[in-house]
Amino acid sequence: MRAAVYHGVGDVRLEDVPEPQPGPGEVKLRVAYNGVCGTDLHEVFDSQRGIPSAPHPLTGAMAPVILGHEIAGTVVDAGAGVDGFDDGQLVTVEPMWHCGECEWCRTGDFNVCERLAFHGMSTHGGGLAEHTVVPAYTLHPTPPGMTATEAAMAESLAVADHGVVRSGARPGQRTIVLGGGPIGIGTMFGLQRRGVEVVAVVEPSPARRAVLAQLGATVIDPGEGALVDQLDGRHVDITFETAAAPASLRNALFVTRPQGLVMLVAAPREPFPPVLNLALIKELEIRATFAYHGEFPGVIDAIASGTYQLDSWVTTRPMTQLHQAFDQLRAGEGLKILIDPSV
């Protein structure tokens, strides 16, 4: 089968590889779509941080690996001990493999497992391939009528939703989202469906601001002046930093009220600047969030019900255009691209 194999920074090859077969407790999928994630772009263009160069302690995987963790696919086969899935059933994948034995797994906090592995990074075969094999516990069946493109969006939107859950945001609080990419949009959606006010989404790209406006967001260009000034001098209770950029973190510290909360929802490409003295002076709480923990079902329901609007910012490409998709997203063009590995 054809797959996108990561050999190192700047070296992703479309190769013919053996088709995987499921072992006990595993399910084989025919991949319909796999989304390109910002994490993939970091690995491809910047540095090899999440893909191991030595055998992973849980999976034994190391580079070269097949990329891809934002997966929608249909069930093809199942290994011994797997029940509850039908051939051809559309599912989405929660791509965290966990040990089930450490302190965090025993309390259900699988996203901080001591030996956590991410499918498509620290496992042998990810979703940028015609077929992939995953543990049955990672699968979420989709409701009737959900499309494969919608199902492939569940992972990235669950990342955003976990940040909203971790923040404890509630109606009556003022929030702002810094960064209008997929995680920023998902954060806005997650806040809105909980009745929390999003005073603005901050985004420097005119094209992305146009999409956000179509989605009903109040949009701010950070180049037009201090955020507080653009908000008529009013600070916010909670800031969601989803751009993972040093300038954006600086803006987050300034726009948040004293004793407010700054949520770090995205992983930075470069170290954040030493501006935390402002957090000290304002007694800010800075809280990080990683992946997800129980958000998939709610996100799937929100997508299926039409609460989350996807049509205006999600596009599809064939696998033959994978490198063009990498370059386009790296340049800040487009928002979310889903890859069809079959073409």
Residue ranges and their predicted role:
Residues 57-69, 97-178:
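NAD(P)H dinucleotide-binding glycine-rich loop of Rossmann-like/cofactor-binding domains
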Residues 250, 293-343:
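C-terminal hydrophobic helical "lid"/dimerization subdomain
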Residues 47, 204-205, 268, 292:
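Residues in the short beta-alpha loop(s) of Rossmann-like NAD(P)-binding domains
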Residues 137, 144-224:
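Mid-domain Rossmann-like dinucleotide-binding core that forms the NAD(H)/NADP(H) cofactor-binding site
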Residues 35, 79, 96, 243-244, ...:
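Short glycine-/small-residue-rich Rossmann-like dinucleotide-binding loops
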Residues 167, 171, 194, 210-285:
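Glycine-rich cofactor phosphate-binding loops and adjacent beta1-alpha1 units
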Residues 20-34, 49-103, 143-145:
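Glycine-rich beta-strand-centered segment in the early N-terminal region that forms part
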